[in-house]
């Protein structure tokens, strides 16, 4: 290799080295100036700075706001649930027992209910905590909500315990179930240590009752999916439909405190900077599944009480109401008979009792004691999440659940067999005429009316005559006509008793006595 070539190579290496040094110097100089612009990532040869990050976050937030504001749905319909549609049913049936006739009648009814207060029955606390983001859809109505899990921005929660002021608030930086729950417990600990000795908590209580006819009717009435709770209460809907049992359900809600979330100014305020709307769309957000967040949760306890009876009386509801209101029913034989055929089941959610703690008794005073005891919050009697409210993220409007369902209202009525007694001791010839209708039902539930007459009608009877006519419990339109022979040419037969459409009684006796010109009558009834 000659000297010229070696000189050329040496000069080239020197030029490359100097170029590298200059480049490194420029880069260092940029970074020195760049206390404002630090490297965060390199993508395709481009340096992405914190300003770029900020721009990306703004773009993500704007995109989330634009798309959520742009969702098209009817808030009245998105959480609208149409339950059972009743088509074919037998409207009436009749059954004979040894001393009674039982009529079971069924009538189609409907119930509509709109509520923003969604009852919590099952252990779904990790999906219904304050600040949780849910999809407003059928699953939410059925108490099994879908939640959106993603990076979140901080939220502020507050507990409405008295006297706490700023101590009753807390910022949750990453609002997951565990972190929100921890923040709530921290606020409660502060209350227990600093405020509980100074303030008392007024328990807010609500009460509702409903006669039970079907599962969908009951879900609409109490504002929750009732399947889970029925595992504890064991309501026999089949026996109710057949008319073999009658059931009333009571719901006592005792709210100790409520945890609320400060509402966001815009939808993106709930999502982390790196979250995109495309990611949210993949998690299910669309026109049919708009996002909502849990804006508040009520903590306390709920007591559900089942009152069940085998009585066929038409006054079951009134008897139960009298019992609930602690009225004196000692003089009401029918109410006492109904309650003697009744039993009571209570299940308690929350408070010092374990979840679904179940009590079965025939003494309603035991139920009253359960309601009365453990009705105030304390560390030993903690609150259980019993209901929550969801709010649409689009406009911060309340997400109300609208239930509508058809159901069959079944009423079973017992009609006890009875009898008519005819007693004639008068000094004349008498004739009796007794007629009635017997009601039954065909296989389609159509009423069949059969006219009946006593076989001894219109025969001459002299004193002393006494007979008993036995009537089934399905006897209706009972008529009794009695006439006596006067011996007068112009009025040979005189009607002395003529009663129509009298109700069936356990025993009704018709007495006649006296003379041809001065007959006497009386009617005695034993119900």
UniProtKB/Swiss-Prot annotation:
Designated name of the protein: Tetanolysin
Modification after translation: Purified 48 and 53 kDa proteins with 4 different pIs (6.1, 5.6, 5.3 and 6.6) in decreasing order of activity.
Pfam families recorded: Thiol_cytolys_C, Thiol_cytolysin
Key word Signal present: yes
Signal peptide extent: 1-32
Role noted for this protein: A cholesterol-dependent toxin that causes cytolysis by forming pores in cholesterol-containing host membranes. After binding to target membranes, the protein undergoes a major conformation change, leading to its insertion in the host membrane and formation of an oligomeric pore complex. Cholesterol is required for binding to host membranes, membrane insertion and pore formation; cholesterol binding is mediated by a Thr-Leu pair in the C-terminus.
Motif (Conserved undecapeptide) on chain: 484-494
TM spans (from-to): 215-228, 235-244, 313-322, 330-342
Family, similarity comment: Belongs to the cholesterol-dependent cytolysin family.
One Gene Ontology term, aspect cellular component: host cell plasma membrane
Source species, domain of life: Bacteria
InterPro entries: Thiol_cytolys_C (IPR035390), Thiol_cytolys_C_sf (IPR038700), Thiol_cytolysin (IPR001869), Thiol_cytolysin_ab_sf (IPR036363), Thiol_cytolysin_sf (IPR036359)
Record text on subunit structure and interactions: Homooligomeric pore complex containing 35-50 subunits; when inserted in the host membrane.
Record keyword Phosphoprotein present: no
GO molecular function per UniProt: cholesterol binding; toxin activity
SUPFAM superfamilies with a match to the protein in the record: Perfringolysin (SSF56978)
Keyword list, A-Z: Cytolysis, Hemolysis, Host cell membrane, Host membrane, Lipid-binding, Membrane, Secreted, Signal, Toxin, Transmembrane, Transmembrane beta strand, Virulence
Biological processes per GO annotation: killing of cells of another organism
Short sequence motif named Cholesterol binding, residue ranges: 516-517
Annotated localization: Secreted; Host cell membrane
Entry membrane topology: Multi-pass membrane protein
């Amino acid at each position: 290799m000659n000297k010229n070539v070696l000189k050329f190579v040496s000069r080239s290496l020197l030029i490359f080295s100097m170029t590298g040094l200059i480049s490194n110097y420029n880069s260092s100089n940029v970074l020195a100036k760049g206390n404002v612009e630090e490297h965060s990532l390199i993508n395709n040869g481009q340096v992405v700075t914190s300003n770029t990050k900020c721009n990306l976050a703004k773009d993500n937030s704007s995109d989330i706001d634009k798309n959520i504001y742009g969702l098209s749905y009817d808030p009245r319909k998105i959480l609208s649930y149409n339950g059972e549609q009743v088509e074919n049913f037998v409207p009436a049936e009749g059954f004979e027992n040894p001393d009674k006739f039982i009529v079971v009648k069924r009538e189609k009814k409907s119930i509509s209910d709109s509520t923003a207060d969604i009852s919590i029955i099952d252990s779904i606390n990790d999906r219904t905590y304050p600040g949780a983001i849910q999809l407003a859809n059928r699953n939410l109505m059925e108490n099994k909500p879908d939640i959106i899990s993603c990076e979140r921005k901080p939220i502020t929660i507050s507990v409405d315990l008295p006297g706490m002021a700023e101590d009753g608030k807390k910022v949750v930086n990453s609002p997951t179930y565990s972190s929100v729950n921890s923040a709530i417990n921290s606020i409660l600990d502060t209350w227990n240590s600093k405020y509980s000795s100074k303030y008392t908590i007024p328990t807010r209580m609500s009460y509702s009752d409903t006669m039970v006819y079907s599962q969908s009717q009951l879900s609409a009435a109490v504002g929750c999916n009732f399947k889970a709770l029925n595992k504890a209460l064991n309501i026999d809907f089949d026996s109710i439909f057949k008319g073999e049992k009658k059931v009333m359900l009571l719901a006592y809600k005792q709210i100790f405190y409520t945890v609320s979330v400060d509402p966001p100014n815009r939808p993106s305020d709930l999502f982390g900077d790196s979250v995109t709307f495309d990611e949210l769309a993949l998690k299910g957000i669309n026109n049919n599944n708009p996002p909502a967040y849990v804006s508040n949760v009520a903590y306390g306890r709920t007591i559900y009480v089942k009152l069940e009876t085998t009585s066929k009386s038409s006054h079951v509801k009134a008897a139960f109401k009298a019992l609930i209101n602690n009225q004196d029913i000692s003089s009401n034989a029918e109410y006492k008979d109904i309650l003697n055929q009744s039993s009571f089941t209570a299940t308690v959610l929350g408070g010092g009792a374990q979840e679904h703690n179940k009590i079965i008794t025939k003494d309603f005073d035991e139920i009253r004691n359960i309601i009365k005891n453990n009705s105030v919050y304390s560390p030993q009697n903690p609150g259980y999440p019993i209901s929550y409210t969801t709010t649409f993220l689009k406009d911060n409007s309340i997400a109300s659940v609208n239930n509508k369902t058809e159901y069959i209202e079944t009423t079973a009525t017992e009609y006890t067999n009875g009898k008519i007694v005819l007693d004639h001791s008068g000094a004349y010839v008498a004739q009796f005429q007794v007629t009635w209708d017997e009601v039954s039902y065909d296989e389609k539930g159509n009423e069949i009316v059969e006219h009946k007459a006593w076989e001894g009608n219109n025969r001459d009877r002299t004193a002393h005559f006494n007979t008993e006519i036995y009537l089934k419990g399905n006897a209706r339109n009972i008529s009794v006509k009695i006439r006596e022979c006067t011996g007068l040419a112009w009025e040979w037969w005189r009607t002395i008793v003529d009663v129509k459409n009298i109700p069936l009684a356990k025993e009704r006796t018709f007495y006649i006595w006296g003379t041809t010109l001065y007959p006497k009558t009386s009617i005695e009834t034993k119900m």
